[in-house]
């Protein structure tokens, strides 16, 4: 991938990881006091299972199981515990689930610049600018409660908040 053509700077990329917008969450820094309060509220309102439709290696689910002692299920486009699913197209509906996820991130522009747009073009047909927006739309249609790690650019995005 070209970083700076003028300066001759290039870097190798993992095109599979880039094309799926994968960024794995391995620490609990996202589990802030307001998030904990929201999770406890969701559990008190009937959420009984944690669902991560973009599970990756499952670190979010492991943390939720340990901290809140609830069962979990995860899906991933590359498979998670044998559960394969393209959740940018459809998230399986699970009764009483709360979605807790770090959705994929990849802008339309970045996909073109990194030459992986052909892998993800179908997701941008809905008119969103970033895969995380596609993911959020799917999450909000699939569960009553959703906790999603999103980039700061979300605040200024055109996504309907």
Where are these regions (language model features)?
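S-adenosyl-L-methionine
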Residues: 1-52, 60-63
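Mobile active-site "lid"/loop adjacent to the S-adenosyl-L-methionine
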Residues: 109-127
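Conserved glycine-rich SAM-binding loop
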Residues: 56
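Conserved Class I SAM-dependent methyltransferase catalytic core
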Residues: 127-161
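Adenosine-cofactor binding site in Rossmann-like domains, unifying the SAM/SAH pocket
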Residues: 73-94, 98
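Short, solvent-exposed beta-strand-terminating loops
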Residues: 99-113
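Short, hydrophobic beta-strand segments that form beta-sheet elements in well-ordered domains
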Residues: 51-53, 69-76, 148
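Short, well-ordered alpha-helix to beta-strand connector turns
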Residues: 47, 95-96, 142-143
